[in-house]
Swiss-Prot record:
Acetyl-CoA 1 binds at residues 98-100. 1D-myo-inositol 2-(L-cysteinylamino)-2-deoxy-alpha-D-glucopyranoside binds at residues 44, 200, 240, 253, 291. Its EC number is 2.3.1.189. It catalyses: 1D-myo-inositol 2-(L-cysteinylamino)-2-deoxy-alpha-D-glucopyranoside + acetyl-CoA = mycothiol + CoA + H(+). Residues 21-176, 173-323 form the N-acetyltransferase domain. This is Mycothiol acetyltransferase. Monomer. GO terms for biological process: mycothiol biosynthetic process. Keywords: Acyltransferase, Repeat, Transferase. Acetyl-CoA 2 binds at residues 257-259, 264-270. GO terms for molecular function: mycothiol synthase activity; protein-N-terminal-alanine acetyltransferase activity. Disulfide bonds: none annotated. Belongs to the acetyltransferase family. MshD subfamily.
Length: 323
């Protein structure tokens, strides 16, 4: 490990997709950070974008800081000190996520990355996620004139919690599993309608869906579709299982639940939520988690009634003044 100061280390700036070796190194760093913190430093969408973007695509910028080490040439994952990734939204705004390897923390690595970002792109229009709301992230945000603008709660239901309530499906509605090669377009249409108010989820494309289907965690049996007697898709509950990571056991996730506008108000959302949770619990998982915006009082109340409790918080930081 190098004992030089990070302010003297070169920052690599890459536009677009990362090459195979660098993406591997970033995943290794992310796994080490996640094991140390109990939270993954990058969102799933960010990793999907890093794999799928075109080379040279400036809507995705990665700032990579390798610690120079005379005993390591070329650089390896063990020498990757930190990474910052900016994904532009196309409207002069973007989202920043940053990770520092546990072995290189408290040495100024994050500040070095942000200085490079500020020099290359500037911070204008950028918001930044802190997954787990770490104290160091809050201090760094303050240094750069940022403050909290959004809270995303992580809620958890332990399998030892009392039984889930009964939540029957509306008359004429049945559940079945997603069928790859058949249901993609119907799901994209239903998802867009269900989340017309939610730009992140509602704007999912076929490429986004295919990228998730290619992930190791994808299981069509855990992708539940609610259909009417004519086979029309009215709602869905897509579940996910996160594998064990170091000391952290595997855990299920209420990945996304959606109901089309014409089927809302029938109790279908609750029925889908309960059905998906039961599917996850039947796999022997110790707990099920989900993400929900802290200010979505109706959703928080529903999940609390099902036995979920607040477990952790992701905080989005935004500029307090125009950069």
């Amino acid at each position: 490990m190098s004992h030089a100061h990070p302010e003297n280390w070169p920052v690599l700036i890459i536009a677009g997709a990362l090459d195979t070796e660098l993406l591997r190194d970033v995943k290794t760093l992310a796994a080490a950070a996640g094991e140390s913190d109990g939270n993954p430093p990058f969102s799933e969408q960010t990793l999907v974008t890093l794999r799928g973007a075109d080379a040279g695509d400036h809507s995705v910028l990665s700032f990579v800081l390798y610690a120079p080490d005379e005993d390591s040439d070329p650089a390896t994952a063990e020498d990757l000190a930190g990474v910052a990734v900016v994904v532009e939204n196309g409207d002069e705004s973007g989202v920043l996520e940053l990770a520092v390897h546990p072995s290189y923390r408290n040495q100024g690595v994050a500040g070095r990355l942000l200085d490079a970002l500020q020099g290359k792109r500037g911070l204008g229009g950028l918001s930044a996620w802190s997954h787990g709301n770490h104290e160091a992230a809050a201090e760094l945000a303050t240094r750069f004139g940022y403050g909290p603008v959004r809270e995303l709660w992580k809620m958890r239901l332990m399998s030892s919690t009392s039984a889930l309530p009964d939540a029957g499906l509306p008359d004429g509605v049945s559940l079945r599993a997603f069928v790859p090669g058949q249901d993609e377009q119907a799901w994209l249409t239903a998802n867009s309608a269900a989340f017309s108010h939610h730009p992140e989820q509602g704007s999912m494309t076929r490429a986004d869906l295919e990228a998730r289907k290619a992930e190791d965690w994808f299981d069509p049996e855990g992708f539940l579709l609610a259909v009417n007697a004519e086979g029309e898709l009215l709602g869905f509950h897509w579940t996910k299982v996160h594998p064990r990571q170091g000391p952290h056991p595997a855990i299920g996730e209420v990945y996304v639940v959606g109901v089309t506008p014409e089927a809302q108000g029938l109790g279908l959302g609750k029925a889908l939520t309960v059905a998906g949770i039961k599917h996850l619990q039947d796999q022997g998982l110790h707990a099920v988690m989900l993400y929900v915006d802290a200010d979505n009082e109706a959703a928080v109340a529903l999940y609390q009634k099902l036995g979920f409790v607040r477990w952790d918080t992701d905080v989005m930081y935004g500029p307090l003044t125009k950069n």
